[in-house]
Amino acid sequence: ADAAPTVSIFPPSTEQLATGGASVVCLMNNFYPRDISVKWKIDGTERRDGVLDSVTDQDSKDSTYSMSSTLSLTKADYESHNLYTCEVVHKTSSSPVVKSFNRNEC
């Protein structure tokens, strides 16, 4: 049966920022079928560079998939923008599932 993804977005950790890097992570959990796409936007502009997607194998218990998408930035790049958004497109929804956060509210 088709299953819609549960989508979460996570800002970089303070520990990572202290080292000069910044990874924003979008998690999509327990979806089916496997075909899914993620689009990253920074302040409303699509960002393709530095994105790494990783799909986990089918879950033996409920036959769903999970995926993480990591947007890797420098700390300076991260701190020069405010709104971070991942948009997830899956057949279970006619419109994208959108998750975002404002950096200055973290």
UniProtKB/Swiss-Prot annotation:
Superkingdom of this protein's organism: Eukaryota
Disulfide bond as UniProt keyword: yes
PROSITE patterns: IG_LIKE, IG_MHC
Domain Ig-like: 5-102
GO cellular component annotations of the record: alpha-beta T cell receptor complex
Positions of disulphide bridges: C26-C86
Name of the protein described by the UniProt record: Ig kappa chain C region, B allele
Species name: Rattus norvegicus
Origin organism lineage: Eukaryota, Metazoa, Chordata, Craniata, Vertebrata
